[in-house]
A protein has these predicted regions:
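Short, surface-exposed "cap/lid" segments of acyl-processing enzymes
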Residues: 30-76
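Active-site nucleophile loop of the alpha/beta-hydrolase fold
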Residues: 45-46, 138-148, 163-165
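N-terminal cap/lid segment of alpha/beta-hydrolase-fold proteins
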Residues: 1-35
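Alpha/beta-hydrolase active-site loop
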Residues: 57, 87-108
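Catalytic histidine neighborhood in serine/cysteine hydrolases
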Residues: 180-190
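Gly/Ala-rich beta-loop-alpha elbow adjacent to hydrolase catalytic centers
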Residues: 116-125
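Short beta-strand/loop motif that positions the catalytic acidic residue
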Residues: 154-162, 166, 174
Length: 190
């Protein structure tokens, strides 16, 4: 499979992933803002519970980042939409994220990388952050208590966003986990 060039306009692409094609959507910054040399890869929630790159929180996060002048890349983890493979409980999904990040860095070496994840996507991006070394990490409703968060070393520039009335991710479990790991972070409670 030929590796596509990074598009200048909004585009849907297929990348070669670790176990086959990965479905990717690239969106440039909003037209009325100054573009920043940053690409934010936004990761979706649990695929076995319907998570896709089209998830409402994922698309809203990408839109907010584009309004700040960032280019966004959303993709489907293995087994979702046009992405090949089978669900791998976060391990293979980290490989998918690393493949997308490698493509971004090869195509736009002058750009900085941010990782953004919602729920399961927050778990995957947190686990991959040590290897990918993003400039910033944004974790929206990280599912503490639902997945093994041991060994996670977030970057210094880490934003955690947690809804106080979240019905899926227990807010107190997130707050307790943040206190236990004692990693520098900014917490936004909504």
């Amino acid at each position: 499979m030929r590796t596509p060039s990074f598009p200048q306009a909004a585009a849907e692409l297929i990348l070669a992933g670790p176990v086959g094609p990965l479905e990717v959507v690239v969106d440039p910054p909003k037209a009325d803002v100054t573009p920043q040399p940053v690409v934010a890869i936004v990761c979706h929630p649990l695929s076995t519970e319907g998570g896709t790159l089209h998830n409402k929180v994922v698309t809203m996060a990408a839109t907010a980042l584009r309004e700040l002048g960032l280019t966004t890349v959303r993709f489907n983890f293995r087994s979702v939409g046009g992405s090949a493979g089978t669900f791998d409980h976060g391990t293979g999904e980290q490989d998918d994220l690393k493949a997308v990040a490698a493509w971004v860095r090869a195509e736009l070496p002058q750009h900085r990388l941010w990782l953004v994840g919602f729920s399961f996507g927050a778990f995957v991006s947190l686990k991959a952050a040590a290897d990918l070394q993003p400039e910033a990490l944004v974790s929206i409703a990280p599912p503490a208590g639902r997945w093994d968060f041991s060994g996670i070393v977030p970057p210094a520039n880490w934003l955690v966003i947690q809804g106080e009335q979240d019905e899926i991710v227990d807010p107190q479990a997130v707050y307790d986990w943040l206190e236990d790991i004692q990693a520098p972070h900014t917490l936004v409670r909504m």
